[in-house]
Amino acid sequence: MNIFDRKINFDALLKFSHITPSTQQHLKKVYASFALCMFVAAAGAYVHVVTRFIQAGLLSALGALALMICLMATPHSHETEQKRLGLLAGFAFLTGVGLGPALELCIAINPSILPTAFMGTAMIFTCFSLSALYARRRSYLFLGGILMSAMSLMFVSSLGNLFFGSIWLFQANLYMGLLVMCGFVLFDTQLIIEKAEHGDKDYIWHCIDLFLDFVTLFRKLMLILAFNEKDKKKEKK
């Protein structure tokens, strides 16, 4: 039999038999909210970079933090769903605004960095998300302690670099941060599944976990590509 004549069963590829139907419905809501966040964040970034009506700064950062705290303080229920979705959209918008300075830096160096970084982030996020969804349940939850330890190490090294001013340490933190965020995609995806299996159906808050993973991945990859492009230009000179 010719292997090229075989039909691919896409239903089997998208079948997650180890995840209950109610949790699968929950995940659909999570990823639908995630898609909404992506569109709203893109609008926020556009407002900063193009219209300059709202600029990234201390106020936008405090606004995003305030919206997140309000979202956390508002209990998940059918009555508060619309309000919490509005808070989520506001948080995503201000997060997009906060990406503005990094976007402007990349545009100044080479505008092609932006689509490359976005496509790269989308591919990384999709691959690691699918890996977590197809893997045996709880198989990546052990990463939690390792990832938090790595985050603590990065935080300490970043504080130390304020005094040393080492570009090498800064770049090492970027690469390490990229690796750590890949781990967080695995960890957060499986943690969302476990929470849903145990009755936690707050898809709006679960969406924030994945949204922040994606944004941080995008920021890290964008800056890595920007610094690499800058180094190439220096070598040509």
UniProtKB/Swiss-Prot annotation:
Instruction: Give, as residue ranges, the intramembrane segments of this protein.
Output: 207-227
Record GO biological process: autophagy; cellular response to unfolded protein; endoplasmic reticulum calcium ion homeostasis; intrinsic apoptotic signaling pathway in response to endoplasmic reticulum stress; lung development; negative regulation of apoptotic process; negative regulation of apoptotic signaling pathway; negative regulation of calcium ion transport into cytosol
Broad class of where this protein is predominantly found: endoplasmic reticulum
Among PROSITE patterns, the record links this protein to: BI1
Top-level taxonomic group: Eukaryota
* Entry comment describing in which tissues the protein is expressed: Highly abundant in adult testis.
- Which residues constitute the cross-link Glycyl lysine isopeptide (Lys-Gly) (interchain with G-Cter in ubiquitin)? 7
Pull the Cytoplasmic topological domain ranges from the record: 1-29, 74-86, 134-139, 188-206, 228-237
Instruction: Name the family.
Output: Belongs to the BI1 family.
Record's comment describing the protein's domains = The intra-membrane loop at the C-terminus acts as a calcium pore, mediating calcium leak from the ER into the cytosol.
- Protein name (record): Bax inhibitor 1
